[in-house]
Amino acid sequence: MAPVSPTDFPQQCHGAVVGLGGNIGPVLDNLQGAIAELALVAGIEVERCSSWYRSRAFGPPQPDYINGCVTLRVSLSPPELLQTLLAIEQKFGRIRLEKWGPRTLDLDLIFYGDRQLEQARLTIPHPQMQYRPFVLVPLAEIAPDWVDPRSGKTIIQLIEQVDCTAVWPVAPGLELGGSLEPEQVFAPGAVAVHG
């Protein structure tokens, strides 16, 4: 695919999906804090948040992950949105040492409207999302009819193709309505998840 620059995307709103996850530290506090940070960014409106789900980690032995998804309305370009996500990860102590290693916070840009994009640092839709029940299960909760532009399949159709038995709900999602204030989202220690 041809390189894309931020100027290739006009300043209009697009739907986007971000997957959130983590498995070390105060995971739910970090996930909810990340949503609060997203809500503070000009050009981002948080629309819906899924419930939180526990799943086994890939890679080396490590704690289970807690994952969820949010739908957004954004006027940022895909590269700008990616930079925002990386900055929020850093703010919550994300250190990139090993692939599939433990992390305080992981934010993945899953969809950006119906766009397909392939760059060195960004591929949209996320190249592995259709194989990941920890993405598909929460996404089916909040956007079951979202269509993967690569396959033409809805999230519901994609979820039927993966084994979801190792994904368990652990906490309700955030109730979002009207304009989102950070204090509505982030109440440290408000929800505890026990092993």
UniProtKB/Swiss-Prot annotation:
Family the entry assigns: Belongs to the HPPK family.
Protein purpose: Catalyzes the transfer of pyrophosphate from adenosine triphosphate (ATP) to 6-hydroxymethyl-7,8-dihydropterin, an enzymatic step in folate biosynthesis pathway.
Residue ranges crossing the lipid bilayer per the database entry: none
Record-linked PANTHER family: 2-AMINO-4-HYDROXY-6-HYDROXYMETHYLDIHYDROPTERIDINE PYROPHOSPHOKINASE
InterPro entries tied to this protein: Hppk, Hppk_sf
Organism (species): Synechocystis sp. (strain ATCC 27184 / PCC 6803 / Kazusa)
Annotated keywords: ATP-binding, Folate biosynthesis, Kinase, Nucleotide-binding, Transferase
Catalyzed reactions per annotation: 6-hydroxymethyl-7,8-dihydropterin + ATP = (7,8-dihydropterin-6-yl)methyl diphosphate + AMP + H(+)
Gene Ontology terms, MF aspect: 2-amino-4-hydroxy-6-hydroxymethyldihydropteridine diphosphokinase activity; ATP binding; kinase activity
One GO biological process term: folic acid biosynthetic process
Pfam entry (one): HPPK
Entry EC no(s): 2.7.6.3
PROSITE patterns, alphabetized: HPPK (PS00794)
Official protein name in the record: 2-amino-4-hydroxy-6-hydroxymethyldihydropteridine pyrophosphokinase
